[in-house]
UniProtKB/Swiss-Prot annotation:
GO terms for biological process: cobalamin biosynthetic process. Part of the energy-coupling factor (ECF) transporter complex CbiMNOQ involved in cobalt import. PANTHER family: COBALT TRANSPORT PROTEIN CBIN. The gene is cbiN. This is Cobalt transport protein CbiN.
Length: 93
């Protein structure tokens, strides 16, 4: 019980502390950081290809990113659940 409370307190701290650390800081994704670093290192760099689909807004881009992550997590956990169920079935035999 004590271990559970300590873990819950740590999770709560990890969720709350980022709001107070670097308050008012700018959030940027890794794509933007990579693009700025490429401009510093090689200002004449030209991309090899253009995206097949450019989302209409940042919200749609975030939605597609989230859906991609959710689908990947669903596939991974389906495989893990299937393997665990199969192992339990084999243990009964």
């Amino acid at each position: 019980m004590k271990k559970t409370l300590i873990l819950l307190a740590m999770v709560a701290a990890l969720m709350i502390l980022p709001f107070f650390i670097n308050h008012g800081g700018e959030f940027g994704g890794s794509d933007g950081e990579a693009e700025s670093q490429i401009q510093v290192v090689a200002p004449d760099y030209q991309p090899w290809f253009q995206p097949l689909y450019e989302p209409a807004s940042g919200e749609i881009e975030s939605l597609l990113f989230t859906l991609q992550g959710s689908l990947g997590a669903a596939v991974i956990f389906y495989i893990l659940g299937y393997a665990r169920g199969r192992q339990r079935r084999d243990d009964r035999v």
